[in-house]
């Protein structure tokens, strides 16, 4: 500027023209940089987190490693029924009318089936509140940026229902609970944040799942109570709370009396952002196998960086929090394990002791 001010007429005109050219060139370069930056950001959304060294390498369920089991697989001295036979005979579910109303995978829980679902969630919520978790009823209609934050978008976008208002239906309360503190800076003394959230959940469940397409194993709409934690940026803290979340669900399963096992998922069967995932698998007598009913994961700062969730330490420095989540309970899937493991020869079903106060009965029968 000083050079232009002190320049003679012709020189000043030349300098002004040169500046105009530079300004135009800079504008073009900035536009090009913006395009490259946008492409880079899109590519970075596909980059996965780094699994913990303890995670087994593999892509199939057979590659998972069993950590521990609880209870003996239930055996009967009579021909046991599957959950469809049991629940239809006791008018706990109506699949035919469910399909008529909601299409493929549609269902109605009714009578004691509906009451059992309510009882399970109320019992679990009470248990988690006793442990100091703050209860939430979370929204299911969610903005896309929340799915990007959790790592569900763009990879799993085809699995999510979209509305005409550009909102999406969440398949887990992990999504809205991550968004709850989006772009906030918490105080270190506020951590850990321990939440338990109930929400209706929706998943398109694209693909052929064989036997799981029948009954209420894989459905488009279900209810879930989810555990969620934000903690300090420490691997040791993440590991500690991961074990806590998993132990909470194991305790719930033990109180329900459902035989189960805990496995650590192989690298090819954990989500994009997860560092490590445990599955809890419940014993299903009609299939003579354990099947996944809970999923417990920690992410380090993978989700919090995308969501912009930080905390300010006592030293004045800021860092991204670490996030974790785990299924506390999900219905109707857990009902399969409850009714099949508690059936009697006459087709009646014993209600787990911890659910009797919520159900008002200890057995359901015709």
What are these regions (language model features)?
Residues 69-366:
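TRNA-recognition modules of translation machinery and tRNA-sensing kinases, especially anticodon-binding
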């Amino acid at each position: 500027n000083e050079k232009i001010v002190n320049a003679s007429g012709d020189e000043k005109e030349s300098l002004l023209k040169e500046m105009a050219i530079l300004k135009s060139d800079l504008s073009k370069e900035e536009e090009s940089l913006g395009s490259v930056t946008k492409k880079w950001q899109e590519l970075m959304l596909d980059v996965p987190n780094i699994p913990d060294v303890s995670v087994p390498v593999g892509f199939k369920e057979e590659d998972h490693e069993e950590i521990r089991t609880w209870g003996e697989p239930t055996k009967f001295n009579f021909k046991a029924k599957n959950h469809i036979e049991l629940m239809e005979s006791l008018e706990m579910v109506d699949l035919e009318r469910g399909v008529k109303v909601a299409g493929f995978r549609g269902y109605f829980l009714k009578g004691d089936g509906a009451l059992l679902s309510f009882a399970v969630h109320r019992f679990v919520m009470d248990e988690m509140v006793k442990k100091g978790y703050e209860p939430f009823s979370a929204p299911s209609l969610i903005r896309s940026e929340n799915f990007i934050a959790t790592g569900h978008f763009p990879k799993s976008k085809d699995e999510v229902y979209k509305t005409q208002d550009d909102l999406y239906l969440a398949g887990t309360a992990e999504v809205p609970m991550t968004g709850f503190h989006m772009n906030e800076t918490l105080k270190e003394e506020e951590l850990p944040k321990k939440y338990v959230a109930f929400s209706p959940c929706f998943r398109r469940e694209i693909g052929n799942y064989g036997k799981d397409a029948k009954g209420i194993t894989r459905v488009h709409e279900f209810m879930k109570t989810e555990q969620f934690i934000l903690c300090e940026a420490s691997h040791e803290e993440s590991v500690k709370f991961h074990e806590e979340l998993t132990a909470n669900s194991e305790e719930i399963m033990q109180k329900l009396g459902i035989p189960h096992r805990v496995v650590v998922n192989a690298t090819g069967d954990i989500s994009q952002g997860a560092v490590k995932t445990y599955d809890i698998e419940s014993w299903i007598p009609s299939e003579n196998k354990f099947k996944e009913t809970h999923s417990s994961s920690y992410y380090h700062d993978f989700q919090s960086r995308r969501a912009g969730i930080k905390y300010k330490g006592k030293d004045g420095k800021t860092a991204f929090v670490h996030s974790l989540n785990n299924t506390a309970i999900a219905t109707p899937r857990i009902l399969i394990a409850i009714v099949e493991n508690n059936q009697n020869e006459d087709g009646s079903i014993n209600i787990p002791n911890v659910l009797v106060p919520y159900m008002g009965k200890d057995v359901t029968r015709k």
